[in-house]
């Protein structure tokens, strides 16, 4: 299993801020193994716990799966009728077809 590691991210800054020197962020990963036991707290110490915590808690970036979306209506599902307007329309259509057959 992989042990703790340290990652440093260097970000360039404009010349006006901090004397034009790049800012480095240091991440300590104390999570051991593929399963991460990160704290659920969002305090400043826990949000800088590892790179994953920083992205999710500080920046709000979550690459995990979102909520499941429902699919579109399939052919087998019933469509609900509204009131009795549809029935009246069917009766009128059936009466028209009978009058056309008589002629």
UniProtKB/Swiss-Prot annotation:
Cellular component aspect of the GO annotation: host cell nucleolus
Source organism: Bovine immunodeficiency virus (strain R29) (BIV)
Biased composition (Basic residues): 67-81
Listed Gene3D superfamilies: Tat domain (4.10.20.10)
Highest taxon of source: Viruses
Subcellular location: Host nucleus, Host nucleolus
Subunit structure: Binds to bovine CCNT1/cyclin-T1. Also binds human, equine and mouse CCNT1.
Protein's name according to its UniProt entry: Protein Tat
Stretches the record annotates as Core: 54-67
Note: The sequence shown is that of isolate R29-127.
Free-text function comment from the UniProt entry: Nuclear transcriptional activator of viral gene expression, that is essential for viral transcription from the LTR promoter and replication. Acts as a sequence-specific molecular adapter, directing components of the cellular transcription machinery to the viral RNA to promote processive transcription elongation by the RNA polymerase II (RNA pol II) complex, thereby increasing the level of full-length transcripts. Tat binds to a hairpin structure at the 5'-end of all nascent viral mRNAs referred to as the transactivation responsive RNA element (TAR RNA) in a CCNT1-independent mode.
GO terms (BP aspect): positive regulation of viral transcription
Family: Belongs to the lentiviruses Tat family.
Short sequence motif named Nuclear localization signal and RNA-binding (TAR), residue ranges: 68-81
Region (Cysteine-rich) location: 38-53
One annotated GO molecular function: RNA-binding transcription regulator activity
Alphabetically ordered keywords of this record: Activator, Host nucleus, Host-virus interaction, RNA-binding, Transcription, Transcription regulation
Pfam families listed in its UniProt record: Tat
Sequence segments annotated as region (Disordered): 63-103
InterPro entries: IV_Tat, Tat_dom_sf
Main localization, broad class: host cell
Coiled coil: none
């Amino acid at each position: 299993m992989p042990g703790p590691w340290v990652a440093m991210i260097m970000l360039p800054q404009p010349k006006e801020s901090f004397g034009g020197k790049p800012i480095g962020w240091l991440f300590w990963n104390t999570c051991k193994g593929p399963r991460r036991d990160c704290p659920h707290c969002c305090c400043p110490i826990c949000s800088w716990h590892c790179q994953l915590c920083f992205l999710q808690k500080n920046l709000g970036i979550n690459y995990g799966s979102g909520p499941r979306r429902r699919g579109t209506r399939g052919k087998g599902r019933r469509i609900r009728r509204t009131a009795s307007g549809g029935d009246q329309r069917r009766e009128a259509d059936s009466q028209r077809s009978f009058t056309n057959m008589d002629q």
